[in-house]
Design a protein with these regions (language model features):
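Aromatic-lined substrate-binding rim segments of carbohydrate-active enzymes
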Residues: 102-163, 262, 271, 385-391
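N-terminal export leaders
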Residues: 22-39
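Aromatic-rich peripheral "rim/lid" segments of glycoside hydrolase catalytic domains that contact
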Residues: 377-442
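Active-site region of glycoside hydrolase catalytic domains
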Residues: 177-341, 352-373, 394-397
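N-terminal secretory signal peptides
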Residues: 1-22, 36, 48
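C-terminal segment of N-terminal export signals and the immediately downstream linker at the start
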Residues: 20, 41-67
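Acidic/histidine-rich helix-loop elements
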Residues: 78-99, 128, 312-345
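N-terminal carbohydrate-binding accessory modules
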Residues: 55-114
Length: 442
């Protein structure tokens, strides 16, 4: 996997320049999935309720992206995931930031070379938003040292940032998960934007000098612009606000420039202090689509893929409001109750085509999240993973699972029907691990 580390160096030294990848070409590519409503990839993905891409006669031309994408493969580690205690019912972490050395060792020993640390800024930040507790940053320091020790790239990510978190779209009455939502909006409040930039200037100063082969910064998880006051008032006139109202395609794309402005502010502040730092932006909205307006910035763009949501989030508590919880047991390819294919490999190829176009223009890409919740049957999960990872291999892209230990991972998933192997006090899903290893070596 040294190839990935070498490729990283190319990203830092190559000038991306201008790109022919435009917003118009993106919309044209996205339109091949007419029935796919844009929803947050990390929360929901794309919901398929209509014909598959093949039924829509979508057959995007394949291209072979340049092999400059970092070939990083690995997992998300959640020790600083959220200060909201309800999440600990679903993910095995204590929110103490104590990233486990065994995780790094096993990830290395199993042939992987990447960890993403999706974190909640409130774990180390005072209510004034500008005071950072140095003691609470030390666990992140340790994780970076463990990455160096085991030859694993560490991606520092704000899963919750000042004024922005995709989890704030959830309805506690439906999910049963209490989320302490942001009180201000990074897109409309200059003070909050300054606080967001302050987080990244702090990290840039603290970790300056650590090469980008070892460390990268992921600005914010699955960016999404929530409805402003006028839009909320309009929604309320139509009736009770639903979770899906947050993910209206037209409104989200209309606000894309709001996110690019915020992303540029943070990236510029980082590079002012550490010009060589690799900066990563998730796709917009919700990690789903490339961002043409950021194509010339030198940032790597990251896709999160949980498509189709009916398969990847079957019976998942925190997508209630997008799914009902009464959906039938999924199959792969995904079919409706009459046997009609709703989503298959060709559908996924069409969904990923905008990312292929972006990569072909010289913009590095990576898939920073994916996976299937524990209630997806193991045979369906493995078939979906095999197709998805094979497509990502054709894109010359690395990828990471959400998560390592827990309901989306390879350890302690509690997935019914899986023949687990005892592994040093944990339950290992050996068939999934073997499949991941196969694709990580491809």
């Amino acid at each position: 996997m040294e190839e990935g580390r070498d490729a990283q160096g190319e990203i830092q030294t190559s000038a991306l320049g201008s790109t022919r990848f435009t917003r118009r070409s993106l919309i044209k590519s996205a339109a091949t999935i007419a029935s796919a409503a844009i929803l947050p990839s990390g929360l929901a993905g794309f919901a398929f309720s209509g014909p598959s891409a093949s039924a829509a006669e979508s057959n995007p031309a394949k291209s072979t992206p340049p092999a400059k994408n970092p070939r990083w493969y690995g997992f998300n580690l959640l020790e600083y995931f959220s200060t909201d205690a309800d999440w600990m019912k679903y993910f095995p972490y204590k929110n103490d930031g104590m990233f486990l050395e065994d995780d790094f060792r096993w990830i290395r020993d199993w042939g992987f070379n990447w960890v993403r640390l999706p974190m909640d800024y409130r774990a180390w930040t005072a209510p004034d938003l500008f005071t950072i507790n140095d003691k609470q940053i030390e666990p992140i320091d340790r994780a970076i040292r463990l990455g160096e020790k085991y030859g694993i790239h560490v991606n520092v990510c704000l899963h919750r940032a000042p004024g922005l978190c995709i989890l704030d779209t959830m309805d506690e009455k439906l999910t049963g998960i209490a989320v302490t939502k942001e009180k201000t909006d990074v897109f409309t409040d200059p003070h909050t934007l300054d606080a967001f930039v302050h987080q990244w200037t702090f990290f840039a100063n603290r970790y300056k000098g650590i090469p980008s082969q070892r460390l990268s910064f992921n600005l914010v998880n699955e960016p999404i612009v929530l409805p402003n006051a006028a839009e909320l008032a309009e929604l309320q006139q139509r009736g009770p606000i639903k979770t899906t109202d947050f993910f209206d395609r037209e409104r989200l794309l209309r606000h894309a420039k709001d996110y690019t402005r915020v992303a540029r502010a943070a990236a510029d502040a980082i590079r002012e202090r550490d010009p060589e730092r690799l900066v990563i932006t998730d796709g917009y909205p919700g990690g789903g689509l490339p961002i043409p307006d950021l194509a010339s910035t030198g940032m790597l763009q990251s896709c999160h893929t949980y498509n189709p949501i009916q398969l990847t989030h079957h019976q998942c508590e925190w997508v209630r409001g997008v799914l009902t919880g009464a959906e039938p047991l999924p199959t792969w390819p995904l079919k409706d109750d009459k046997g009609k294919v709703l989503c298959d490999r060709q559908t996924l190829e069409a969904l990923f085509h905008p990312w292929s176009e972006l990569s072909a223009q010289g913009v590095p890409i990576h898939f920073g999240e994916m996976g299937c919740y524990k209630h997806t049957p193991p045979d369906v999960m493995l078939a979906w993973f095999d197709d998805t990872l094979d497509i990502l291999g054709e894109l010359n892209s690395g990828w990471a699972l959400w998560n390592f230990r827990g309901p989306f991972g390879v350890l302690d998933t509690e997935r019914s029907g899986t023949k687990f192997e005892d592994w040093q006090g944990h339950k290992l899903d050996r068939p999934l691990l073997t499949l991941l290893q196969k694709h990580a070596k491809a």
